[in-house]
Amino acid sequence: MSNIMLKVEDLHTAYGQSEALHGISFEGHANETVAIMGRNGMGKTTLFKSLMGVLPLKSGRIEVAGQDVSRDESFRRVAKGIAYVPQGRMIFPTLTVEENIQTGLENSKTKRIPEEIYALFPVLWDMKRRKGGNLSGGQQQQLAIARALVTDPKVLLLDEPTEGIQPSIIKDIAKALNEIRKLRGITIVVSEQVLSFAMDVADRLFVIEGGRLVHETARDKTDVNHIKAYLSV
């Protein structure tokens, strides 16, 4: 499979003197979803913050659609095609749903929200005049993803998108992510602890442990019990 959208090579990230990521390497292709599985404290969020430029790299290289973004500030990475939905559903509680999505259109020539966004997340259409702070957790997560998508990314990073969300909404999010990927041909990278969700969306699964990728498998070859062993304390 060619058409690499995200290439991560030998990534090392440190908090002060303490190294947190030890030589992480992986690729994400167009129209592919990759899951990074792991328990809390194993490096998932550190990896995403490093990919986004929130944390500086100690060494290594990150490419988006062939462009080196390793030394770029976060906003330049966004301009080159990375979108990031951090853990905890970062939305603007006092803005309406529609206004929240429009904040992702700041650099766009038009302020019009593409119709496909509401087609992917019908609940947002129904609630577009409602304040973000009045949505449920699952609705806020869909809003955060919608806002990231209007930046027209090549790579979409989702840090634990199912955290604290009821199972029926998790299914909706999985369905939307699968549609987005096909529709746009983008790479989606999710960090996750819920294996059933990862199996619904990911083509390939990695396990991160102690800041290293220790296991990789294609979805159809996944040994569920093997991965569950990594996820249980």
What are these regions (language model features)?
Residues 37-39:
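The feature captures the beta-strand-to-loop junction immediately N-terminal to the Walker
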